Amino acid sequence: MAKVQVNNVVVLDNPSPFYNPFQFEITFECIEDLSEDLEWKIIYVGSAESEEYDQVLDSVLVGPVPAGRHMFVFQADAPNPGLIPDADAVGVTVVLITCTYRGQEFIRVGYYVNNEYTETELRENPPVKPDFSKLQRNILASNPRVTRFHINWEDNTEKLEDAESSNPNLPSLLSTDALPSASKGWSTSENSLNVMLESHMDCM
């Protein structure tokens, strides 16, 4: 049984200019005291073609964590544009929030991110070299992809099989036909994971 349940993730400052920090308000609950820290990460997928372009925007240790409900705002700087392939700068990518305990990842929340120019002229005639200062980042906050993993929470070395789901296939995730058209923009009326995904995020 999982000792930590993520109850809610709220995407803050969305949409925003590309260079603005990512901000997520995370609410989670521990069913008992944790003797070691939780490690949270924000990872930006620079390209679906290769993991070498993934950027860990920030990593923070939270703990020791007592039993009960906790909330914090996780903020991370924007990705380094110099590490993003020019062909992948504009369009749809993914940002991931992960949490590990004793080096074991037990939850991953992925959001589609659409980077596009706000000026009509630039959208119709984009520059060969991306101008990141003109890009707007829009996170599809109402449709996260949640993946949970069984881990060993106890003070022993017993290995547990991953029984919930495997790591998300990012190329598949990015090629989904369900994505809204970038030209139409995305609705930002819902910026919260909230308990609408409770059936997918219940405690293991």
From Swiss-Prot:
Domain of life assignment: Eukaryota
UniProt KW keywords: Chaperone, Chromatin regulator, Nucleus, Phosphoprotein, Transcription, Transcription regulation
UniProt subcellular location: Nucleus
Pfam family, one: ASF1_hist_chap
A GO molecular-function annotation: histone chaperone activity
Modified residues (Phosphoserine): 192
Main localization category: nucleus
Region feature Interaction with histone H3, CHAF1B, and HIRA, mapped onto this chain: 1-156
Chain spans, region Required for interaction with HIRA: 155-204
PTM note: Phosphorylated by TLK1 and TLK2. Highly phosphorylated in S-phase and at lower levels in M-phase. TLK2-mediated phosphorylation at Ser-192 prevents proteasome-dependent degradation.
SUPFAM superfamilies: ASF1-like
Signal peptide: none
Family affiliation: Belongs to the ASF1 family.
Function statement: Histone chaperone that facilitates histone deposition and histone exchange and removal during nucleosome assembly and disassembly. Cooperates with chromatin assembly factor 1 (CAF-1) to promote replication-dependent chromatin assembly and with HIRA to promote replication-independent chromatin assembly. Promotes homologous recombination-mediated repair of double-strand breaks (DSBs) at stalled or collapsed replication forks: acts by mediating histone replacement at DSBs, leading to recruitment of the MMS22L-TONSL complex and subsequent loading of RAD51.
Subunit structure: Interacts with histone H3 (via C-terminus), including histone H3.1, H3.2 and H3.3, and histone H4; the interaction with H3 is direct. Probably interacts with the heterodimeric form of H3-H4 taking the place of the second dimer. Interacts with the CHAF1A, CHAF1B and RBBP4 subunits of the CAF-1 complex. Interacts with CABIN1, HAT1, HIRA, NASP, TAF1 and UBN1. Found in a soluble complex with NASP and histones H3 and H4; the interaction with NASP is probably indirect and mediated by H3-H4. Interacts with CDAN1. Found in a cytosolic complex with IPO4 and histones H3 and H4. Interacts with CREBBP.
Name of the molecule in the record: Histone chaperone ASF1A
Upper classification of the organism: Eukaryota, Metazoa, Chordata, Craniata, Vertebrata
